[in-house]
Amino acid sequence: MIFTLASVPDTMKTLMQAYGAAVVACPTPESRWALMRQGIERLGWYPTGGFVLPPIGSNPYGVDGYKTIAYEVAEDLDWTAPDVLVVPSAYSDGLFGIWRGWTELHALGLVKTLPRMVAAEPFGPLANALERQLDVPERVVSGSSVAFSIASPYGTYQGLTALKDSHGVGVRITDEGIFEAQRALAREEGIFAEPSSIASVTAVMQLSSQRMFDPEQTIVAVITSTGLKDPGASRAWLPPVPSTPDDFDGLLTVLRDRYGLSLD
C-alpha cells in the first residue's frame, strides 16, 4: 500500500502501480498520515514512512538504509570523506541516515575525517532552526515549489542534529535555481535529474557563487531521482517542439527562431 498525493505526476503513480503497489492518492500530507495511522492501529499495518505531525522521520530501518550511500561514496573516494556532502532534504531521512553512515565509518577507523553536511531545502526549516539556534525545527512559511518531493515546511530533530554535529548548514533553494542546475547538468554532464533531486546541485551552485568553498575541497552532491519521473516540470525552461516544416528553408527558419541555430 502506497499513500501518495493527488498532485504527484501521473508518471510516478504509474511506476508505483507497475511494481505492484496498491496506490491511493490523498489531497494533503496530513490526510495521508491520518489514514496510515488508522491502518496501523486497526489492521496492524507496518509503516515504512512517517505518519505523525509534526514529522519525526520514517521507519528507523529505512533511515539506516541510507547509510549505504556513505559507504559507496567512501569507497568511490578511496576511503576518504569529502569535505562537504549535500543532500536534498525534507524530513531528513536521507540526510540523517547518510550522516550516521559516516560516523560509523569514522568510529571503525575506515575514514579519518567527517564531511560537513548540507541540507538543500525549498523553504528552509532546518536553515531557520540553525539561524535561530533552535533545539527543534519550527514550521516555516511555505508555498509552491517544483521540488514537490522535498517541499515541506517542517524539519525534523534528526536532520537538525546531523547539521549541528557536522557543523553543516541548510540552504534555501528556488525554482529558478533548480531549473538552472537541471539544464546545466543535463547539457554538460548528460544527467537529467528530477527537480527535487537536483536540489543538491542547486545548493552547490548557490554556495559556490557565494565563495563558500575552497577550490581544493571535495564536494559531493547526492542526486536521488531521474528527471524521467517528472518530465513535465522541465517544460518551464524548454521551448515547445515545433512541427516539421514542409521545406528545408522552412526548417532552417524554425531552427533559427525556436532554438537560436543559424545553419545557413
State each model region's role:
Residues 201-263:
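Catalytic phosphate/nucleotide-handling subdomain of diverse soluble enzymes
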Residues 56-70, 194-198:
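A glycine-rich, Thr/Ser-enriched phosphate-binding loop motif common to dinucleotide/cofactor-binding enzymes
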Residues 33-54, 62, 104-192, 236-264:
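Active-site/ligand-binding loops adjacent to catalytic centers
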Residues 1, 9-13, 91-98, 126-129, ...:
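Short glycine/serine/threonine-rich phosphate/pyrophosphate-binding segments
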Residues 1-39, 130-135, 230-236:
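Active-site-proximal loop->helix
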